[in-house]
């Protein structure tokens, strides 16, 4: 039996985490929630994650720093970056580091699910190549 994709949500806003959990689990994916990048890194989740949704502004490591850390650690996790304060420089940094999408909060269901589909397709393509 094929496993359910595991989506990690890293956002310091509990209401955002819960809203994303409700949406993502409603389409059949497993969701794990984290209030900080450090909580995510300290868990066993990175090795199992099929896609990470990262807020830019987090306590401690930012979402962009987490994205870079995962890449340095050899974790090929597709990343979707979400933020309330979108600017061109931050978007350019996220995309240059390999983000699948850079989304401004509030994110619509359709936009997020489309980005998730693209991220999971990239993860599948990476697994086929390796």
Task: Describe the role of every protein-language-model region.
Residues 89, 107-117:
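C-terminal output helix
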Residues 14-32:
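Two-component/phosphorelay signaling modules centered on CheY-like receiver
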Residues 65, 86-101:
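Alpha4 helix (beta4-alpha4-beta5 surface) of REC/receiver domains from two-component response regulators
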Residues 42, 64-75:
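Short amphipathic alpha-helix used as the core "switch/output" element in two-component signaling
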Residues 35-36, 62-65:
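Acidic catalytic/metal-coordinating carboxylates
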Residues 33-51:
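Acidic, metal-coordinating helix/loop segments flanking the phosphotransfer/catalytic sites
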Residues 17, 59, 87:
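The feature encodes the CheY-like receiver
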């Amino acid at each position: 039996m094929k496993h359910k994709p595991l989506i990690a949500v890293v956002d310091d806003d509990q209401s955002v985490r819960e809203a994303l959990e409700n949406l993502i689990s409603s389409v059949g994916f497993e969701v794990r929630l984290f209030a900080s990048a450090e909580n995510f890194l300290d868990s066993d989740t990175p090795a199992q994650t099929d896609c990470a949704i990262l807020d830019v502004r987090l306590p401690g490591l930012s979402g962009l720093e987490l994205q870079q850390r995962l890449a340095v650690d050899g974790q090929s996790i597709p990343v979707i970056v979400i933020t309330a304060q979108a600017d061109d420089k931050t978007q350019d940094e996220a995309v240059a580091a390999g983000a699948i999408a850079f989304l401004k909060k509030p994110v619509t269901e359709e936009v997020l699910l489309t980005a998730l589909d693209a991220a999971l397709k990239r993860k599948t393509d990476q697994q086929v190549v390796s």
